[in-house]
A protein has these predicted regions:
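Conserved N-terminal beta-strand and adjoining loop/helix that marks the start
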Residues: 1-20, 40-43, 64
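Conserved acetyl-CoA binding element of GNAT-fold acetyltransferases
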Residues: 34-39
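Unchanged
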Residues: 41-64, 72-129
Length: 148
């Protein structure tokens, strides 16, 4: 099977309570799943620019996403049904609190990404529905800011 390359920026949005924002996807062709904010890098965009754009579009938060904190290569089928090999770059954004607005969601996102919530690590570990990345808890632990 040929997979299309898909550069993508993903955001680990973490509030002051240590909870991570996740979106619930309900595609027509598979069971629901949860995912961090983010998406494909548009032509001419850097990963950093894509992270900032995706953060604004999906959450309403307009700010710099800081440096890349992780990178993964993953294969999956997009919501549109395209088989891809994604080069995902992760950016961590820590906020005191944030009320998500879906005002920037595309028509497709409005249809398949109808809910979101903030998860603690314990809630993620006990959650019945799949979430991506599957090693999110380890990724959050590895990117936790250190205080000197």
């Amino acid at each position: 099977m040929i997979r299309l390359p898909r550069p993508a920026a993903r955001i680990l949005l973490v509030d002051a309570a240590g909870r991570t924002l996740m979106f619930r996807f309900t595609p027509d062709d598979r069971p629901p799943f949860w995912c961090t904010p983010g998406g494909a890098v548009d032509p001419g965009e850097s990963y950093e620019q894509a992270a900032r754009r995706e953060l604004l579009e999906e959450t309403g938060l307009d700010r710099d996403c800081g440096p890349q904190v992780a990178r993964r290569q993953v294969e999956f089928r997009t919501i549109e049904g395209v088989e891809v090999e994604a080069d995902e770059r992760y950016f961590r954004v820590d906020v005191d609190a944030h009320e998500v607005t879906g005002a920037g969601h595309t028509a497709l996102e409005q249809r398949v990404m109808q809910s979101w919530r903030w998860f603690s690590r314990a809630e993620l570990a006990a959650h019945a529905e799949p979430y991506f990345p599957t090693d999110l808890i380890d990724l959050l632990d590895a990117t936790e800011p250190t205080h000197v």
